[in-house]
Every structure is written in structure tokens, then in C-alpha cells.
């Protein structure tokens, strides 16, 4: 087993932990309004989870022998092409939200991003996790990757 074999799986484990934290914030928001600090935490959890998601994609492609992924857009396009993700447009919107959240702080922008996280992105993250866990299981059973 090479470092690439293990790396994507280690990154997936980190992604899973981050996604659980994001989901906890989403669940909290569904029960009551969040304080300003909690809102910031939800957005930061989204940013962190997104960063780990595209890095899982990138590391998985390296494991598959494809090392030309340069950033989140490349990773997202490649992941959609091989059905690691289903909603390519939703993931591209997620990149836009991620960029908006990290480069500006505007209450209206933050609230719009929080709505997208709770209504769309959290579910996309969960579906991606399910797909990658299934591939991890196949890899452990020696059945290969996306095509295996």
C-alpha cells in the first residue's frame, strides 16, 4: 500500500469529522436562530468542510493515477465526470459561496451562504461522503476504484 492509497482515506476521515461538525451547526440552526458567533462558526465549518471535500477528490484522483488536479474547480469537474458527485452545478455554486465567504464579510452575503449550506450544501456533502465511503469499502475489498 502506497502513501497515495492511504492519503485519500486519511483525508476522508478528516472530512467525515468536519462534516459531522457542520451538520451539528445546521441542526442547531434548524432548531433556533443562531447567535452571531454561531453563524460565523457555521460559515467557518462550511469553508473547512468544502476545503477537505475537494482535497479528498484530489487525493482520490492521485490514488487513481490522475495528478493534474490544480484546484477546487478542477477537482469538482473531474469528480462530476466520474460520478463521485451528482450535482456538478450545485458544487460549482458551493465554490462561489466558499470564495464569497472567505473574501468578504457582509451580513447579507453571510446569511445567503448559511441558507445555501442548510438547504443544499449539507446534503451534497453527505452524498459525497456516502459515495467515498462506498469506494473506500471497495478499495479495502480489493475491488478498485470508480470503475471497479
Residue positions per predicted region:
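Solvent-exposed interaction patches of small proteins and small membrane subunits
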Residues: 1-148
Amino acid at each position: 500500500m502506497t502513501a497515495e492509497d492511504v492519503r485519500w482515506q486519511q483525508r476522508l476521515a478528516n472530512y467525515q469529522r468536519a462534516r459531522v461538525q457542520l451538520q451539528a451547526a445546521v441542526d442547531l440552526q434548524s432548531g433556533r436562530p443562531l447567535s452571531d458567533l454561531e453563524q460565523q462558526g457555521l460559515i467557518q465549518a462550511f469553508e473547512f468542510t468544502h476545503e477537505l471535500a475537494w482535497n479528498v477528490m484530489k487525493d482520490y484522483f492521485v490514488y487513481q493515477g490522475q495528478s493534474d488536479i490544480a484546484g477546487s474547480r478542477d477537482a469538482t469537474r473531474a469528480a462530476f465526470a466520474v460520478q463521485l458527485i451528482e450535482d456538478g452545478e450545485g458544487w460549482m455554486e458551493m465554490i462561489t459561496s466558499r470564495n464569497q465567504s472567505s473574501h468578504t464579510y457582509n451580513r447579507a452575503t453571510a446569511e445567503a451562504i448559511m441558507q445555501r449550506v442548510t438547504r443544499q450544501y449539507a446534503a451534497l456533502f453527505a452524498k459525497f461522503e456516502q459515495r467515498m465511503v462506498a469506494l473506500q469499502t471497495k478499495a479495502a475489498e480489493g475491488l478498485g476504484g470508480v470503475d471497479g
